[in-house]
From Swiss-Prot:
It comes from Pseudomonas putida (strain ATCC 47054 / DSM 6125 / CFBP 8728 / NCIMB 11950 / KT2440). It holds the Pfam family RBFA. InterPro entries: KH_dom-like_a/b (IPR015946), RbfA (IPR000238), RbfA_dom_sf (IPR023799), Ribosome-bd_factorA_CS (IPR020053). This is Ribosome-binding factor A. GO terms for cellular component: cytosol. One of its GO terms (biological process) is maturation of SSU-rRNA.
Length: 132
């Protein structure tokens, strides 16, 4: 059985694909780094869309802010091209936000790996104590 998706989810998914291609091809601003669009959340009335991005290779908050500033200033340009490619009657206003879930995931993975390594050390130390 096919999954049921709402119209806003389908539009958000299509916007994610289209925006990724538009940013790669059309945005020539040097402040925009290697941007990955992680999600697009479209409001129910299709008036606004939150576009969540990550910037690869740019871990400093200043570089991320510069990319966000450049993308938000190019939002009307991107919106115009989205309207042409998606053939929507009204294209949502675009609001770009940094997606911290990727960096949080990396941090949590590092914490888990460190905890596992410490458990192995304690386990090895306990086994060597019982052998003696």
């Amino acid at each position: 059985m096919a999954k049921e998706y709402s119209r806003t989810q389908r539009i958000g998914d299509q916007m994610q694909r289209e925006l990724a291609e538009l940013i790669r091809r059309e945005v020539k601003d040097p402040r925009v780094g290697l941007v990955t669009i992680t999600a697009v959340d479209v409001s129910r009335d299709l008036g606004h869309a939150k576009v969540f991005i990550t910037v690869m290779g740019e871990e400093t908050p200043d570089a991320v802010q510069q990319s966000l500033k450049a993308l938000n200033s190019a939002a009307s340009f991107l919106r115009l091209h989205l309207g042409r490619s998606m053939q929507l009657r009204s294209v949502p206003q675009l609001h770009f936000h940094f997606d911290e879930s990727v960096s949080r995931g990396v941090h949590l993975s590092a914490l888990i790996e460190r905890a596992v390594a410490e458990d192995r050390l304690h386990k090895d130390a306990d086994e060597s104590d019982t052998k003696e």
